[in-house]
């Protein structure tokens, strides 16, 4: 049986388009089985982006169930580790793909009665990781609503569109900013009740501010202590930028450029709310040795992740005082990367 990482590796090795990758994964799952938990993947090439989801076929079956939806060219799709695919119009081959057993397994397992309209997420997932019977969580809602406020999406809905057309064009910097989101200044801000009184040195008056020690990445012990002192002090919300993240990336696929420079992965390690991103071109064949060393499960000075992690953990201690410095450094490195990327791309384009 395949795990999701193995399927990803084989698809990347053997396929040149997103559609080819989806078909190959489907064939491998049908023949050899899928033994991992439910997963969703974004599978993209320079011309298309697809949202792909896969589940096992059952405890006594070697196989799997999967479905895929193409994100329209002018849309943005979001899935944060939950099933998002709803109805499947398999007659529309330009937009939808699915395993042959997608409906039969749902009926056999009692997930769908065959009478009500079939919804993939409802049959194979039933809800999000908070136990809510929804095809989204706060993360999907926040991003989709931020990009298309004109749609007036409701958090009380059972499901949201798998993708939306943004109210204005989305740049790579916009995606980076969304991946840094902690809901600061919104109703979901986990630090909004963590206030302290401070005396203004100039006016001698007392102001109430968010505590410098407050941060959106507080652990369970801290949250339990604060809520133990006063119930309801902090409502835990799943952030877009989570501190347990090992790495994240924003990938640009530009079909008007040669492959070697048309693809760029903007990579960062550790907490995406604090870490700057660096550009890695698809034509890159080598990186500094520290990038090839795994420091995920233990401290290693020679692993790049620990350079990020150390700075982030220290900054978090008094985030209210260090936030501006960290954000300024992130902006500096990302702006430097963006300007140098544009220059490098122009330098490497063939001349006529």
Q: Locations of the language-model features?
A:
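Extended, regular secondary-structure scaffolds
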Residues: 37, 46-181, 186
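Conserved small/polar residues in nucleotide/adenosyl-binding loops
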Residues: 345-352
């Amino acid at each position: 049986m395949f795990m999701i990482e193995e399927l990803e590796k084989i698809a990347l090795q053997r396929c040149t388009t997103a559609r080819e990758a989806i078909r190959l994964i489907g064939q491998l799952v049908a023949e050899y089985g899928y033994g991992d938990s439910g997963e969703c993947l974004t599978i993209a090439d320079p011309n298309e982006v697809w949202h792909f989801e896969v589940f096992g076929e059952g405890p006594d079956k070697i196989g799997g169930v999967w479905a895929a939806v193409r994100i329209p060219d002018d849309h943005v799709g979001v899935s944060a580790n939950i099933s998002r695919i709803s109805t499947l119009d398999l007659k529309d081959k330009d937009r939808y793909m699915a395993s042959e057993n997608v409906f039969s397994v749902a009926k056999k397992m009692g997930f769908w009665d065959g009478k009500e309209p079939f919804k993939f997420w409802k049959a194979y997932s039933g809800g999000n990781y908070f136990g809510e019977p929804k095809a989204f969580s706060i993360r999907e809602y926040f991003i989709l609503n931020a990009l298309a406020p004109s749609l007036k999406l409701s958090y009380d809905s059972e499901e949201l569109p798998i993708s939306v057309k943004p109210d204005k064009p989305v740049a790579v910097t916009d995606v980076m900013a969304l991946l840094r989101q902690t809901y600061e200044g919104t109703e979901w801000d986990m630090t909004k009740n963590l206030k302290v009184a401070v005396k203004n040195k100039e006016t001698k008056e007392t102001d109430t501010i968010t505590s410098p020690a407050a941060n959106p990445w507080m652990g369970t012990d801290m949250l339990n202590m604060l809520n133990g002192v006063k119930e309801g002090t902090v409502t835990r919300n799943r952030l877009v930028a989570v501190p347990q993240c090992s790495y994240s990336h924003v990938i640009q696929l530009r079909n008007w450029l040669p492959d070697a420079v048309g693809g760029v992965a903007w990579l960062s390690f550790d907490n995406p709310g604090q870490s700057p991103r660096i550009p890695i071109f698809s034509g890159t064949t080598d990186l500094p040795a520290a990038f090839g060393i795994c420091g995920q499960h233990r401290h290693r000075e020679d692993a790049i992740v620990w350079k990020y992690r150390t700075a982030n953990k220290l900054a978090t201690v008094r985030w209210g005082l260090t936030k501006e410095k960290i954000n300024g450094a992130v902006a500096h490195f990302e702006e430097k990367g963006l300007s140098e990327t544009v220059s490098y791309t122009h330098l490497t384009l063939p001349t006529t």
